[in-house]
Amino acid sequence: MDRPHTPILDQVNYPSDLRRMSNADLAQCADELRAEVISAVSETGGHLGSSLGVVELSVAIHAVFNTPYDKLVWDVGHQCYPHKVLTGRRDRIRTLRQKDGLSGFTKRSESEYDPFGAAHSSTSISAALGFAAAQDLGEATGDGIAVIGDGSISAGMAYEALNNAGDLGKRLFVILNDNEMSIAPPVGAMSKYLTDLSAKSPLATLKDIADGVASHLPEPIRQGAERARELVTGHQPSATLFEHLGFTYIGPVDGHDMEELLTTLRAAKARATGPVLIHAVTVKGKGYSPAELSDDCYHGVAKFDVATGQQKKSAPNAPSYTSVFGQTLLNMAEADSRIVGVTAAMPGGTGISTLQKAKPNRVFDVGIAEQHAVTFSAGMAAGGLKPFCAIYSSFLQRGYDQIVHDVALQSLPVRFMIDRAGLVGADGPTHAGAFDIGYLSALPNMTVMACADEAELVHMMATAAAHNDGPIALRYPRGEGTGVALPDQGDVLEIGKGRVIQDGHDVAILSFGAHLEEAKDAATALEARGLSVTVADARFAKPLDTTLIDDLMTKHSALITVEQGAVLGFGGLVLHHLAATGQLDGRCAVRTLHLPDRFIDQASPAEMYADAGLTADDIAQAALEAMGVEVLAARA
């Protein structure tokens, strides 16, 4: 496809080039940068809407602040595509989220302009404050700048950082990227006022800027600006939450007006002596009408046609695990009034939106607040409800103490629905669900399941609904199922019991979770070598089906465990049982296949599992090595 015409952007290799440009050229550069991002993401897919919303902010921040000496920290990081183009990575921008390409998030190892990596929310203020503390103690670092969205700033960690920043009183810049509030009326008047300001203006303090914005507006517009300020701060304009915390508050300002942004940032940089919060109002998907008109503002997109906005998604071969979860939850909720759903700002991503649309009073979206989601679910369980708490595996890590203290310790029957278990593809290591098997199985009272296919997901959800003897967790992967027929309703499984898929007598492959198909393929390869193979589906990591494991050990010469989780997960639990019962001293060789002890960069899931050594060929090779050359020779 034709690339956009970008004569001004072509002059930018690094942010220092922006600092030599006029304001008019910077505005033109932003327009060209937006076109470049749209063009690039149309070829790669990715987080388009959030990136389009911060184009002007990206240009203005890099033009005003001395990055990389000044430390720019993007919260979440999924809006960083314009930032990457401006910081020496334009030549690789069309490798976003691909194997050996650019990460879709900020990443310290990728560029000195990414001083702090991100992909989970609400960390930026803490990190930027850390840089400010390092500067005060003599380290060679400049100002700390955090760019955080209105969703991310709602999380508890962000408020902890704001509270600490206000208490320390260090020079710090927090830019609130507010893309949910429309304040169109005051934009023009504020722009005219702020354009008259400069870093050399006679204003004595930043408070003059903050207070002067509203005072220079006509009465109806001033009231609108004050309402916007009240909504974002939670207090009356005369006593904002941020000001109570020790911040100077400036805003709201138009996050797409280059003159206004430059004037505000330059004045703030020149005059700040303590923490400053700049409230910039932006539009998610700005400048690309298909994104602006979309319900999710093209938050995450596949490759698409720039002219039409039509996404190029391949037709699914089977329903996704997420959609099966959503429909099954609705079906069960219709039969049981005690079933409720809980999500932490991901109703669509988790599939819980299916229940939310049908029974909105039975779904609770708590925002980006996993800790609260877990304990809130615990409270509902204690109150007699059956909460299904649906959180991605990598995000559930954020609520681990609550799982331990508020759920497991009290043996409360919270049902944890853990989507995105295993490797997830283009989002890379930050979103991989690698650790939940180990960290959940370590807890007393916890039951841990993983489904081999979408039909098993339905059965395990029914099992979770019926389980009232403590918390229970069900992990399942991102993407399509295997295409098996779905039952009309799930069967309640016996807790701690697996199943044998096929019987053999030489090698046993014991799979936990969605790698069962690879286990079957490995069995086929081994059978072609003359080996008789048993394939079993563990179903449960906790409690283990020790009867099944003992039987496999007794009847086979090799046992191979397979899982989509980290070391010390399911395989570790099996080894612990075998060691405790003296079975590692016997005739059966044991090998555990799991994710390696390292983080795996983005690629397709198939490429990532190949990198991890978890293909069918890897499973077969592990079995052959466990059997030994002499055994194989005897069967040749």
From Swiss-Prot:
Q: Does the keyword Phosphoprotein apply?
A: no
Q: Which residues bind thiamine diphosphate?
A: 78, 119-121, 151-152, 179, 288, 370
Query: What does the Swiss-Prot or TrEMBL cofactor note state?
Result: Binds 1 Mg(2+) ion per subunit.
Reactions catalysed according to its record: D-glyceraldehyde 3-phosphate + pyruvate + H(+) = 1-deoxy-D-xylulose 5-phosphate + CO2
For this protein, the record's SMART domains field holds: Transket_pyr
What cofactor is needed? Mg(2+); thiamine diphosphate
Superkingdom of the source? Bacteria
The record ties this protein, via InterPro entries, to: Dxylulose-5-P_synthase (IPR005477), THDP-binding (IPR029061), Transketo_C/PFOR_II (IPR009014), Transketolase-like_Pyr-bd (IPR005475), Transketolase_BS (IPR020826), Transketolase_C (IPR033248), Transketolase_CS (IPR049557)
Q: Which PROSITE patterns match?
A: TRANSKETOLASE_1 (PS00801), TRANSKETOLASE_2 (PS00802)
Q: Its Gene Ontology molecular function terms?
A: 1-deoxy-D-xylulose-5-phosphate synthase activity; magnesium ion binding; thiamine pyrophosphate binding
Q: Which residues bind Mg(2+)?
A: 150, 179
Do the record's keywords include Glycoprotein? no
**Alphabetical UniProt keywords:** Isoprene biosynthesis, Magnesium, Metal-binding, Thiamine biosynthesis, Thiamine pyrophosphate, Transferase
Q: What is its EC number?
A: 2.2.1.7
Which terms does the UniProt entry file under GO BP?
Answer: 1-deoxy-D-xylulose 5-phosphate biosynthetic process; glyceraldehyde-3-phosphate metabolic process; terpenoid biosynthetic process; thiamine biosynthetic process
Pfam families named among the record's database cross-references: DXP_synthase_N, Transket_pyr, Transketolase_C
Quick one: which pathway? Metabolic intermediate biosynthesis; 1-deoxy-D-xylulose 5-phosphate biosynthesis; 1-deoxy-D-xylulose 5-phosphate from D-glyceraldehyde 3-phosphate and pyruvate: step 1/1
What family is it from? Answer: Belongs to the transketolase family. DXPS subfamily.
Read off the NCBIfam families from this record.
Answer: dxs, PRK05444.2-2
HAMAP family, from UniProt? DXP_synth
Q: How does it assemble?
A: Homodimer.
Which function does this protein serve? Catalyzes the acyloin condensation reaction between C atoms 2 and 3 of pyruvate and glyceraldehyde 3-phosphate to yield 1-deoxy-D-xylulose-5-phosphate (DXP).
Question: What name does this protein carry?
Answer: 1-deoxy-D-xylulose-5-phosphate synthase 2
**What is this organism's lineage?**
Bacteria, Pseudomonadati, Pseudomonadota, Alphaproteobacteria, Rhodobacterales
